[in-house]
C-alpha cells in the first residue's frame, strides 16, 4: 500500500504532526502520510510510547521540543521540513481514501494553489456531529511553507497566514475531536489556560459581563 500510492505522487511533500502522549493515535496518523516522502514529528517530550512508535516508520524525523504554545510548535514543524509542500494533521484527524486521492490529484496538477482549506467532519465519542456549527468548519492543512506561516502571538486556535492563492478540497477530513466527556473537559481547560495567557500578553482582562453577552448572543 505504501509504495503503490507513493509512486503516483509527482511532488515531494512532508507530513507534519505535533504530539504529546499520542500513542493511541500516532500509528493511524502516520499511516495517513504513506504518500509523503518525509514525516516530521514535533514531540513535546511524551511520557508514553509516542516516539517509540513513530521511529518505527520510514522517513520519520522526530524533533523533541518543550511545549510553549501550539503556534510555536507548528512553526518549528515547518522549519524542520525539507520540502516546500507540507500536509499538517493533528493526532485526532484522519484522511479518507477519497481525500487522499484528491490531495494527490492536486499535487500532480501543473498549476496548484499555494494553500488548501479542508472541511472537517466532527465526531464526538465516535459519533458524527451534524450541527452546532461544526459542519462549516475548515482549516488549512495542505500548503507551501514558503507561502505561509502561523501567526505569532496566537497560543491556541492558531492561525495560518497565507501569502498566495487559496483552494478548497471537496472531500472532508475526519476529526475525532473528543473520545469522551472527561477528555473534552481536560481539553477545554487546557485551551482556556492558553487563551488566558494569550489575552494577558495583550494586556486584556477578563470581563464577566462581556463573556455573558458573547454567550447569550451566539
Feature locations, PLM:
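Short, Lys/Arg-enriched N-terminal segments with co-localized hydrophobic residues
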Residues: 2-10
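Cell-envelope/extracellular polymer assembly enzymes that use nucleotide-activated donors
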Residues: 12-14
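Short, well-formed alpha-helical segments that are part of the catalytic scaffolds
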Residues: 16-35
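Acidic helix N-cap motif at the loop->helix transition within catalytic regions
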Residues: 24-27, 48-56, 98-99
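A conserved acidic beta->alpha catalytic loop
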Residues: 32, 43-52, 67, 90
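Conserved donor nucleotide-binding strand/loop of the catalytic core
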Residues: 51-80
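Catalytic-site signature of metal-activated, phosphate-bearing donor transferases
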Residues: 72-78, 85, 89, 96-218
Amino acid at each position: 500500500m505504501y509504495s503503490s500510492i507513493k509512486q503516483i505522487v509527482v511532488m515531494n511533500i512532508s507530513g507534519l504532526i505535533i504530539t504529546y502522549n499520542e500513542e493511541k493515535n500516532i500509528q493511524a496518523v502516520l499511516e495517513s502520510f504513506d504518500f509523503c516522502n518525509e514525516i516530521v514529528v514535533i514531540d513535546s517530550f511524551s511520557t508514553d510510547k509516542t516516539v517509540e512508535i513513530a521511529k518505527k516508520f520510514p522517513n520519520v524525523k522526530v524533533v523533541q521540543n518543550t511545549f510553549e504554545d501550539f503556534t510555536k510548535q507548528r512553526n518549528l514543524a515547518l522549519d524542520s521540513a525539507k520540502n516546500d509542500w507540507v500536509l499538517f494533521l493533528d493526532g485526532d484527524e484522519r484522511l479518507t481514501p477519497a481525500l487522499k486521492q484528491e490531495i494527490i490529484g492536486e499535487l500532480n496538477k501543473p498549476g496548484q494553489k499555494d494553500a488548501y482549506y479542508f472541511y472537517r467532519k466532527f465526531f464526538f465519542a465516535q459519533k458524527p456531529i451534524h450541527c452546532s456549527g461544526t459542519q462549516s468548519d475548515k482549516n488549512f492543512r495542505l500548503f507551501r511553507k514558503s507561502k505561509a506561516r502561523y501567526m505569532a502571538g496566537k497560543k491556541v486556535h492558531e492561525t495560518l497566514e497565507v501569502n498566495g492563492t487559496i483552494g478548497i478540497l471537496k472531500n472532508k477530513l475526519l476529526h475525532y475531536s473528543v473520545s469522551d466527556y472527561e477528555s473534552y473537559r481536560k481539553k477545554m481547560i487546557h485551551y482556556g489556560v492558553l487563551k488566558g495567557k494569550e489575552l494577558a500578553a495583550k494586556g486584556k482582562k477578563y470581563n464577566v459581563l462581556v463573556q455573558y453577552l458573547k454567550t447569550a448572543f451566539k
